[in-house]
């Protein structure tokens, strides 16, 4: 639950900051503060922070600080694209190398045949590359307000749909001692 809150909390803070706090600059500041709090809480409670969270936070801090200093919202808008491309490369390369990164993230929930982890890695890579393109299209062609709404009401449902579409693979290829 804490991990979910640490991922969603900064997005909610960004959304609230944009609509109730006065635009992208304030939203970026709120998101940075919330992210610092969430990472700190995760570390205090779990004594660790995941590699993906470290990558996400690093890109967020760099793009967020540049946005705040420069006053140019482009930097916070390209943050998702940068993250999606990085994650896409990680999942693609781990599939190619037959050492699927996604296995380490999900193995405590589901145990799969090795070839299924590789398929899931490729699918996840494709999903992240797709999301990078979608983010670029939305931020470059629509208003700030539309982009912010898309971040909450578009990305989350699209991600949920992607996860649901993976269920047949997971259920068909799970090992007998799997939790799902």
UniProtKB/Swiss-Prot annotation:
Q: Where does the record say this protein resides?
A: Cell inner membrane
- In which domain of life is the source organism classified? Bacteria
| Database matches in InterPro entries | YciB (IPR006008)
Naming one, the record's GO cellular component terms include: plasma membrane
Membrane-spanning ranges: 25-45, 49-69, 76-96, 118-138, 150-170
Question: Briefly, what is this protein's role?
Answer: Plays a role in cell envelope biogenesis, maintenance of cell envelope integrity and membrane homeostasis.
The protein here is known as Inner membrane-spanning protein YciB
Q: Which organism is it from?
A: Rickettsia prowazekii (strain Madrid E)
């Amino acid at each position: 639950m804490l991990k979910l809150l640490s991922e969603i909390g900064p997005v909610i803070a960004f959304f609230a900051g944009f609509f109730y706090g006065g635009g992208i600059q304030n939203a970026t500041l709120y998101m940075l503060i919330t992210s610092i709090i969430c990472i700190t809480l995760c570390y205090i409670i779990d004594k660790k922070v995941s590699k993906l969270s470290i990558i996400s936070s690093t890109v967020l801090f760099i793009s967020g600080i540049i946005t705040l200093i420069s006053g140019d919202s482009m930097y916070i808008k390209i943050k998702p694209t940068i993250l999606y491309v990085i994650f896409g490369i990680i999942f693609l390369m781990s599939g190619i190398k037959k050492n699927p990164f996604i296995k380490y993230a999900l193995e405590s929930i589901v145990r799969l045949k090795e070839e299924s982890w590789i398929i899931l890695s490729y699918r996840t890579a494709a999903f992240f590359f797709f999301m990078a393109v979608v983010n670029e299209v939305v931020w470059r062609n629509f208003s700030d307000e539309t982009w912010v709404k898309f971040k909450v009401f578009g990305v989350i449902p699209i991600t949920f749909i992607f996860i649901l579409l993976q269920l047949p693979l997971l259920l068909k290829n799970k090992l007998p001692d799997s939790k799902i």
